[in-house]
Amino acid sequence: MTDITRPENPESRCGFVAIVGRPNVGKSTLLNHILGQKLSITSRKPQTTRHQVLGIKTEGPVQAIYVDTPGMHEDEPRALNRYMNKAAASALIDVDVVVFVVDQLAWTSADEMVLEKLKRVKCPVILAVNKVDKLEKRELLLPHLEALSKKRDFAEIIPLSALKETNLEPLESAVGRFLPESVHFYPDDQITDRSERFMAAEMVREKITRQLGAELPYSVAVEIEEFKHQGNTLHVSALILVEREGQKKIIIGDKGERLRSIGQEARVDMERMFGSKVMLRLWVKVKRGWADSDRALKSLGMSDF
């Protein structure tokens, strides 16, 4: 493993940490459990994360600024997929540490593709072997870790379970050791750089993803049209964009039941995060070809890198 030494007992450390990996290995779950609250949306469906999400964790003198990225995947022709790949790749620029997340004993061509992209990275790369709680034959883990250690000179290799919060402390400790001495960039109580509007849109999109499962088309986006505090109530109006009428019917459901359920669950999460009563209104609109249009992506805040 790489021997990267840092001065002992620094007064203050701060830096950027990119969390990368192929889709559905648990990157967003890892970030959420490190922070101690939900910031990135999660589901069993791969490629749920579309944006870089900045999560900030401050523990005493150490401030780690985590960037949760979309899963890197094989090249796709759609503009949305190109955007997601660019978002993931851009997270590797000017970071201080990379956490490369893989799925326990599984190693795929997509993992190899991510590893290939990491060859250009000069900072420490920590390999986080996630979901070890699901291993049926634990005796296979050590040989697998030894095989992984030969693929790259990793700064650390840490088996963990993000969901069960197993071995997260060694991971955070390793990240902290590799961060540079620096003043903190953010207030110690700040956990993200994202706006409340962005977080509201992500909460709605998560509920759509979780409720629809295999029915969900990837080409679903959420646009916040109103986000306004009036007295003790937060009024939020969100537009759900799909590409076809059939997708619209799926999201609305029989007599609007599915859409109401999505709204109820999203509202509960918003009230918990924003600390106020929320009045949430949802609409569904067909916008054909938005996931293939660079212009449409930019209008939704998904700009080129």
Swiss-Prot record:
Region (G3) location: 68-71
Keywords: Cell inner membrane, Cell membrane, Cytoplasm, GTP-binding, Membrane, Nucleotide-binding, Ribosome biogenesis, RNA-binding, rRNA-binding
Protein name, per record: GTPase Era
UniProt region (G2), positions on chain: 47-51
Region G5, annotated ranges: 160-162
InterPro entries: G_ERA_dom, GTP-bd, GTPase_Era-like, KH_dom-like_a/b, KH_dom_type_2, KH_sf_prok-type, P-loop_NTPase, Small_GTP-bd
GO CC, alphabetical: cytosol; plasma membrane
Cited CDD domains: Era, KH-II_Era
UniProt binding sites for GTP: 21-28, 68-72, 130-133
Taxonomic path: Bacteria, Pseudomonadati, Pseudomonadota, Gammaproteobacteria, Pseudomonadales
Region (G1): 21-28
All copies of domain Era-type G, residue ranges: 13-181
Chief place where the protein resides: cytoplasm
Subcellular location per the Swiss-Prot or TrEMBL entry: Cytoplasm; Cell inner membrane
Organism: Marinobacter nauticus (strain ATCC 700491 / DSM 11845 / VT8) (Marinobacter aquaeolei)
